[in-house]
Design a protein with these regions (language model features):
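Short, low-to-moderate order helix/coil transition modules at the start of elongated helical scaffolds
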Residues: 1-207
């Protein structure tokens, strides 16, 4: 036998929805902090890449001078030194290219994550509105029921029903908005998942 559903059950649902709102807001804030950290990481990585490029320019200058000296048999420069430096330059060029792709992937991800957090907050706000209106419509229903039990006259009864219908209409509108916000939230989350895949694919060996 199914339990009897009471008005209190729906009021409890509204209270629980408010708890979900609170947790959504907390998660959004935590994700904002993480986004800021990822932005800072990308910024520091870009600075390191710039230094690496400057290092390569210096290495190329050294090699150019070494190659000039190699023409002199009595110079203290060996072919092995030049070859080793050339290998370092070649590897550094590869690291710069890989890191640039990685930095771009992080930037794209953080931009989408900012939009995702925005949609999460909109979802939370819409859910909060639904919880408020759910509670209001139930309390209004209880009030109307109480008045009906007092056998109020016809005109007052019509007014009570009209008032309740207004509350119900407000709730229905809020719920429609919530459903729309949930769909938007899920859509952006799927887009974010795709960007995580791109970020993962951009990771390669980099010293």
């Amino acid at each position: 036998m199914s339990p009897i559903i009471t008005h209190e059950d729906e009021l409890e649902l509204a209270r629980t929805e408010k708890e979900v709102v609170s947790q959504l807001k907390r998660l959004a804030k935590a994700q904002n902090d993480l986004i800021n950290s990822q932005k800072k990481y990308a910024e520091n990585l870009a600075k390191a890449n710039l230094v690496r490029e400057m290092l390569n320019r210096s290495f190329r200058d050294v090699i150019k001078q070494m190659q000039t000296l190699l023409r002199e048999k009595k110079s203290n420069v060996q072919d092995e030194e030049v070859n080793l430096y050339q290998d370092i330059i070649h590897n550094n060029d590869g690291y710069v290219e890989v890191n640039n792709k990685y930095i771009d992937a992080i930037k794209n991800l953080t931009l989408k994550k900012e939009y995702f957090v925005e949609k999460k907050n909109e979802f939370a706000d819409a859910l909060s509105d639904v919880a408020d209106k759910r509670s209001a419509v139930i309390k209004k229903a209880l009030s109307v029921e109480k008045m009906k039990n007092k056998l109020v006259e016809g005109e007052k009864l019509k007014k009570l029903d009209a008032d309740f219908n207004d509350y119900q209409r407000d709730f229905d509108i809020a719920r429609d908005v919530l459903i729309k916000k949930i769909h938007q939230f899920l859509e952006v989350r799927n887009e974010l998942d795709d960007l995580w895949t791109i970020l993962k694919d951009s990771v390669s060996k980099s010293s």
